[in-house]
Amino acid sequence: MAKQGSKEKKGYPELKEVIKATCKIRVGPGKETLTEGNCLWALKTIDFIFEDLKTEPWTITKMYTVWDRLKGLTPEETSKREFASLQATLACIMCSQMGMKPETVQAAKGIISMKEGLQENKEAKGEKVEQLYPNLEKHREVYPIVNLQAGGRSWKAVESVVFQQLQTVAMQHGLVSEDFERQLAYYATTWTSKDILEVLVMMPGNRAQKELIQGKLNEEAERWVRQNPPGPNVLTVDQIMGVGQTNQQASQANMDQARQICLQWVITALRSVRHMSHRPGNPMLVKQKNTESYEDFIARLLEAIDAEPVMDPIKTYLKVTLSYTNASTDCQKQMDRTLGTRVQQATVEEKMQACRDVGSEGFKMQLLAQALRPQGKAGHKGVNQKCYNCGKPGHLARQCRQGIICHHCGKRGHMQKDCRQKKQQGNNRRGPRVVPSAPPML
């Protein structure tokens, strides 16, 4: 039993490196990462659900098979949260198995969903394309749109190597950096509009920056509508953004202009947000000082946001978000205590009401009192605990004045481990040794 228990403890040795990489993925922006226990829970749960796949090794093919089967299941109302956690954890493991490094669980789910849609489209049309163009494999590259010798075009998903490289650049230099802009402009020349926008959404970056980028894209779309009235040969905003098109349709030659315009809009949005970030008075750089009251900080922040040339929904989002993230540590703690879980969605007025006393003498005295106050039951432990030697409360056994009492024979002057009566008994009453082992999983 002992050997069997130690063998089971190893878990899934073929996924050791995959689980290690998965443990670097965060549950959400700024939140904790997944743990090895989360991964093992997901893998063992899947083994119990699909017993016919339990003996097969954990390859990417098996993971996709499990993913497809999970989509066909309908969990009970009480198990929906656990089922969603199971799918999310599996998506993270699949990304790690493919060598991708998503920053959050949501990004991993987006990657798998995108690849799944691309795979379905590829399987539906793959057989027909291979029959028409038998030499297709000779012309495949890292680009989604492939020109064929026999004429026409074929679409291929963005390579994971390219996606991972863009993700690394975004994490190291920033989403709106010049390095990321150059990399995106280089690879996206042969991407469809849908590919460009989906890759941009799944890149790691500041939420406020992503909202500003989306706002700039909306401004470009509105400008296009004003300058290009509807006509027979005029591209619509939906065509430029790839809305309502299949990947095969978006890869054809008649959509080249739309793809170029979409890429130009994205680059313009990245540059606008980058210039905004480096310009004096940038709202994201307005942070509360140590000696500054929350009201004065909010006044500076709102003035900077109102001066930005962005739409009202973006301004509202920046006010709600930055009024918490750019506040001081004391104000953030006070908002957490007062507003609880809805602190991120609370209005600026509610946050000002919560932080009105931060920095005052009364607030400082309250913090000092909390720091000196005993924490929970631990503060009263020494008062209520009884002495194991004499049985009286108010002191510990090592502080007892009545001397040491043997808990085996009841006499004073020695401890239980030195008791002679205990040594004389030997091991006659000792039973067989019990080896601890993990219980069987039901």
UniProtKB/Swiss-Prot annotation:
Sequence motif PTAP/PSAP motif, location on chain: 436-439
InterPro entries linked to this entry: Gag_p24_C, Primate_lentivir_Gag_pol-like, Retrov_capsid_C, Retrov_capsid_N, Znf_CCHC, Znf_CCHC_sf
Keywords on record: Capsid protein, Host-virus interaction, Metal-binding, Repeat, Viral budding, Viral budding via the host ESCRT complexes, Viral release from host cell, Virion, Zinc, Zinc-finger
Site for Cleavage, residues: F363, K364
Molecular function (Gene Ontology), one example: zinc ion binding
GO cellular component: viral capsid
Region named Disordered: 420-442
Keyword hit for Zinc: yes
Zinc finger (CCHC-type): 385-402, 404-421
Cystine residue pairs: none
Pfam families, per database record: Gag_p24, Gag_p24_C, zf-CCHC
GO terms, biological process: viral budding via host ESCRT complex; viral translational frameshifting
Record note on domains: Late-budding domains (L domains) are short sequence motifs essential for viral particle budding. They recruit proteins of the host ESCRT machinery (Endosomal Sorting Complex Required for Transport) or ESCRT-associated proteins. Nucleocapsid protein p14 contains one L domain: a PTAP/PSAP motif, which interacts with the UEV domain of TSG101.
Entry similarity comment: Belongs to the Ovine/caprine lentivirus group gag polyprotein family.
Protein name per UniProt: Gag polyprotein
